[in-house]
């Protein structure tokens, strides 16, 4: 669950409805892989991730980024039940993929950077604060199975 006021929820959902999940998803995942290169070990099957240019040109990074943000969008539709929404993904990442749950926070922060870059002045301090709450809630829900 994310503690947003009714006005904050309305603002977050309005901005989210403008997000190009393919573009922003690929960029957010790409940034994660470049800024935190140790995360690349989970994506060895993606091919060449040897340079930032290779990461951002990688079709598999773009496709998986879109998949990630599409799933994130499902969470946006269920802000009051994030743990339920992400229960199966939490189990997958914990039991099968063995992803360090700290990576969910890192990816959330990359998403905030990408949204700020794409939306400029529209992504003001208020919107930033709201989205930090959302990405923290999603990261917490994804880490739920680990507890």
From Swiss-Prot:
Globin domain: residues covered: 3-147
Residues with Phosphoserine modification: 45
Origin: domain of life: Eukaryota
Gene3D superfamilies linked: Globins (1.10.490.10)
Record InterPro entries: Globin (IPR000971), Globin-like_sf (IPR009050), Globin/Proto (IPR012292), Hemoglobin_b (IPR002337), Hemoglobin_oxygen_transport (IPR050056)
Binding site for heme b: 64, 93
Record-listed N-acetylvaline modification sites: 2
Keywords for the protein's UniProt record, in alphabetical order: Acetylation, Heme, Iron, Metal-binding, Oxygen transport, Phosphoprotein, S-nitrosylation, Transport
Gene Ontology MF, one: peroxidase activity
Biological processes, Gene Ontology terms: hydrogen peroxide catabolic process
Quaternary structure, from the entry: Heterotetramer of two alpha chains and two beta chains.
Family the entry assigns: Belongs to the globin family.
Name of the protein this chain belongs to: Hemoglobin subunit beta
Organism, scientific name: Dasypus novemcinctus
Taxonomic placement: Eukaryota, Metazoa, Chordata, Craniata, Vertebrata
Designated gene of the protein: HBB
């Amino acid at each position: 669950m994310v503690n947003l006021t009714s006005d904050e929820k309305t603002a977050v959902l309005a901005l989210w409805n403008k997000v190009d999940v393919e573009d922003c998803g690929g960029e957010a995942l790409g940034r994660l892989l470049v800024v935190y290169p140790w995360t690349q070990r989970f994506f060895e099957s993606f091919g060449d991730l040897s340079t930032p240019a290779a990461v951002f040109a990688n079709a598999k990074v773009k496709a998986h980024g879109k998949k990630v943000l599409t799933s994130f969008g499902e969470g946006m539709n269920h802000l009051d039940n994030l743990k339920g929404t992400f229960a199966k993904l939490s189990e997958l990442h914990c039991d099968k993929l063995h992803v360090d749950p700290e990576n969910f926070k890192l990816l959330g922060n990359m998403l905030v950077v990408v949204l700020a870059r794409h939306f400029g002045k529209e992504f003001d301090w208020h919107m930033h604060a709201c989205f930090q709450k959302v990405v923290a809630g999603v990261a917490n829900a994804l880490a739920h199975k680990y507890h």
